[in-house]
Amino acid sequence: VGTSPYDETVQLKENTPFKTKNETINRLVEYQKESAAKNNWEFTDLNAPMTAINQQYQQKDPTFTLCGSDRIHPDNDGHMVMAYLFLKAQGFVGKEVADMEINANKKQAVKSENCTVSNIKKNGKDLSFDYLAEALPYPLDTIARGWGQKKSQAEVLKVVPFMEEMNRETLKVTGLKGNYKLLIDDEEIGTWSGDELAKGINLAAESKTPQYQQALTVMHLNEYRWEIERTFREYAWCEFGFFQQK
């Protein structure tokens, strides 16, 4: 993997850039790329696309950067861009969390990708069905977590099409007229028109769904794991840097 860049072009207060530093980094990236080709290893580069994003958005906002307040350590949005690029390189674009389509008039599941749709019932204007997904949506964190971090994961949506390409849990229902209230496990999620439901809605963007809440639980567990890991790492750093005998 070609590393994320050193941002020489962002305008930061009291932070003079080291000119040509990213050129040096790119020479290392090129060496990695050549080595990967020689050994038939897979390779993807984060440096060039992240630099391109930085420079694109700096045309309107010279203080924009994915690389944090020190030009080199990405903020939360930068880490999400790295994850997006890494997954894209593995062919993850277009992989649905789930994709389901129901014909309300026929009480029939037309499509059920990466999920199971069953027990479809229509009683008057009410439509119900059982839905079991094989994956959870990705819950984009809206909090700037981590020491010194100023941006949240969710800010990644301003710069890459993460939701459209990698985080779609599509519900499409045809044959409905008027407005319909969607409930999952008796939890009201929202109200959509028959036309909107026929076009399809992305449940991964709805934070009140039970599956989104399950995904949040996993996210918080992972944050807890990371805090434990960071604590041990920082302890080892302090022990090495300050407590060893000189």
Indicate residue ranges for each PLM-predicted region:
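Conserved catalytic region of serine esterases and O-acyltransferases that act on ester linkages
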Residues: 62-246
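Extracellular serine-dependent O-acyl
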Residues: 1-5, 23-64, 80-98, 179-181, ...
